[in-house]
Amino acid sequence: MASISWVLNSLFSILLLTQRVNSESTAEKQALLTFLQQIPHENRLQWNESDSACNWVGVECNSNQSSIHSLRLPGTGLVGQIPSGSLGRLTELRVLSLRSNRLSGQIPSDFSNLTHLRSLYLQHNEFSGEFPTSFTQLNNLIRLDISSNNFTGSIPFSVNNLTHLTGLFLGNNGFSGNLPSISLGLVDFNVSNNNLNGSIPSSLSRFSAESFTGNVDLCGGPLKPCKSFFVSPSPSPSLINPSNRLSSKKSKLSKAAIVAIIVASALVALLLLALLLFLCLRKRRGSNEARTKQPKPAGVATRNVDLPPGASSSKEEVTGTSSGMGGETERNKLVFTEGGVYSFDLEDLLRASAEVLGKGSVGTSYKAVLEEGTTVVVKRLKDVMASKKEFETQMEVVGKIKHPNVIPLRAYYYSKDEKLLVFDFMPTGSLSALLHGSRGSGRTPLDWDNRMRIAITAARGLAHLHVSAKLVHGNIKASNILLHPNQDTCVSDYGLNQLFSNSSPPNRLAGYHAPEVLETRKVTFKSDVYSFGVLLLELLTGKSPNQASLGEEGIDLPRWVLSVVREEWTAEVFDVELMRYHNIEEEMVQLLQIAMACVSTVPDQRPVMQEVLRMIEDVNRSETTDDGLRQSSDDPSKGSEGQTPPGESRTPPRSVTP
């Protein structure tokens, strides 16, 4: 009986705990929904009410997902005033980052409930009002950055309540009055470009001049020494009590002479005082003019949009730096496409460690690892001729394309000097690297089933671009076919041709361009089909279209294959790595016929892309998975049906009609 009672009590306790966790999660979820519903935002966060808040973009929970510990929404286009009763209800929050948005108004007083908060980043917004008193009650705060806003009034002495604070960034606001003596263990401190005056307290004098620059009336510490223009000079002995001196020496000076001396001395003093005031006003006017000409934010490093290999930096929670983009980069922000899964901004990209993945005809691709661990690919375009409006219009079209075999555009950036595209990172790499990588003894060959899978999934992606999106790819090649670990592919670098000038002809040695593109310098759906046909030949032969060993100098891959087939040496066409697999000759010949139809020199004789896809799927034989793709087998002793073939089963491939 006692054991039953213990079990019932345990179950009751678990039920109460579960109910409590659910209520806490529901309350925090509702707080976030309240925030999102009352704050307009340019980039849709697409928080699904039916999903757990812990799975939403920018939201991180604790290990058991009972409470929200981090909310990061930098550069997400948030506009307006934070509603009371929203974020202030996230009482377990540790990190809050709303930087680089257009949030305005005063900070809600219920922010004082965020007593567990350690890092608060609100820089580069339009917040106003005096220093929020709610901040001084956040005793666990370590980093506070409210720089580049419109805060006014004095900096309160109660900042000293934040005993754990190591970084305080208040620059580029309208704070005025004297600096309070802040006796905290600050490592980073910045109040530049405000209206502060008076002397810098000794407790803050250890920081560099850059921390205080832009405050004209601030002095002391690392700045100029404080001086008073109204200190009376030591009086001359000749003017000390002249009447007494005269009387002691029994001077014969008359009273009129004494009065004249006093008046003259007063006039000289007034002239000196007027001169000092004139010099003071002149100096102040010059300082104001210099400050007016100084671009804001001053004292903050402006960073060029460059991702050099090996660049790196520490996490936001560690640095808390208030890097301003300034000028054009402030006006041209990173634009996220609809349905994006990322929440970072241009500043994050600039601080990311970067590695060059490759250089192509349209630009250079970098692997960028952001501070929170997210990995993306940043393509830096070159020689873009499109205007900003044309660029943005084309990116809106590209950004709407969603398909499992088309890599999605996540974000883009346009400025006069830089054009950037952001994509998902595919760790398996490209078809080019997999097919033409080192062919030494340590290489794992790409078997036939995986080559068929690559051909089908790439065809599906390209057919979607042509049929559903009505978009010409324009740059199909093996390096633009990216792979998932299961050998499914994603087509990349699509729809970019309209951004570049047609004045320069494509490089014929590239090997993928249709003959008519060399003449018209325009890509079409049929030229895409030609390029895809070259890609199929590449899968079949194992040869790169750029490979010099195709025979005659200047011969391309389609002509080389055609010359071999005409001599009825069809077997010589196929990649030697495929010769170890049995019972696949018929499929290889069928795929070769499809490829040769695609690379017809007459555009009208080429099939449309959806027909190409249908033909490739027909080649795919009986052993299929649920998605219509065959299971891969790396065992060359097994036939394509999974059976061990007899030793004499290999038959010569049938001929291909040119």
Swiss-Prot record:
Extent of the LRR repeats: 65-89, 90-113, 115-138, 139-164, 166-183, 184-207
Residue ranges annotated for the Protein kinase domain, each copy included: 351-619
Residue spans of biased composition, Basic and acidic residues class: 619-638
Compartment annotation: Membrane
Sites where a glycan is attached: 48, 64, 113, 150, 161, 190, 197
Region (Disordered): 289-329, 619-658
Residue list for modification Phosphothreonine: 374, 520
Keywords: ATP-binding, Glycoprotein, Leucine-rich repeat, Membrane, Nucleotide-binding, Phosphoprotein, Receptor, Repeat, Signal, Transmembrane, Transmembrane helix
Binding site residues for ATP: 357-365, 379
Any one GO CC term of the record: peroxisome
Domain notes: The protein kinase domain is predicted to be catalytically inactive.
Name of the protein this chain belongs to: Probable inactive receptor kinase At2g26730
Record organism: Arabidopsis thaliana (Mouse-ear cress)
Organism lineage: Eukaryota, Viridiplantae, Streptophyta, Embryophyta, Tracheophyta
